[in-house]
């Protein structure tokens, strides 16, 4: 349930600025907003950020999705049509391309900044996991069995020598997508 108020949001931002000894933050995102919570964030919480922006304490107001709870990106599709969102963070990858047609055209038209998360997950960085996942998709009838014939189902991405490995290919793919402003890199060590 949504228990924060505009006042608690403002108080937390002010406290964070004091603790970090900053005058402002460049972007404040409401993170992992579920579709059912969107209107609450927009109508109840976001006005606090707008006031902080007017005071020069927040430069840009943002919102981020929760991919596992909104795989069709319904919340973002609504948010990018409305005030006050100036920047969004969303999941996008070689295997999750819905934003290409559902989100990026609007963000480009409206000048909304985009930060990509989840560009590389285990499916790209772990060959055994990747093969097992694709084998399961073949077993379910969602992919043709020929995808497994050459060993690595995504091996074609490095076959021509353009990318060093699958992870590199996934990052390259994301950074060249029209409508992408920032690609966030993960914190893993593999």
Where are these regions (language model features)?
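Short, charged beta->alpha transition segments
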Residues: 12-20, 49, 76
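Active-site groove signature of glycoside hydrolases
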Residues: 17-36, 40
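Glycine-rich anion/phosphate-binding loops
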Residues: 3-11
């Amino acid at each position: 349930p949504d228990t924060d108020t505009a006042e608690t949001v403002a108080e937390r931002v002010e406290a964070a600025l004091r603790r970090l000894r900053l005058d402002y933050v460049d972007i404040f995102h409401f993170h992992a907003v579920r579709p059912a919570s969107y209107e609450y964030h927009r109508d109840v919480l976001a006005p606090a950020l707008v006031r902080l922006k007017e005071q020069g304490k927040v430069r840009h107001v943002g919102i981020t999705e929760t991919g596992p709870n909104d795989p069709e990106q319904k919340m973002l599709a609504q948010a990018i049509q409305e005030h006050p969102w100036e920047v969004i963070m969303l999941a996008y990858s070689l295997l999750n391309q819905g934003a290409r047609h559902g989100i990026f055209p609007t963000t480009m038209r409206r000048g909304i900044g985009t930060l990509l998360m989840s560009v590389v997950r285990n499916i790209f960085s772990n060959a055994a996991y990747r093969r097992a996942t694709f084998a399961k998709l073949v077993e379910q009838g969602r992919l043709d069995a020929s995808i497994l014939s050459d060993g690595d189902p995504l091996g074609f991405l490095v076959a021509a020598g353009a990318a060093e490995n699958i992870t590199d290919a996934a990052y390259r793919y994301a950074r060249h997508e029209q409508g992408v402003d920032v690609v966030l890199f993960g914190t893993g060590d593999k």
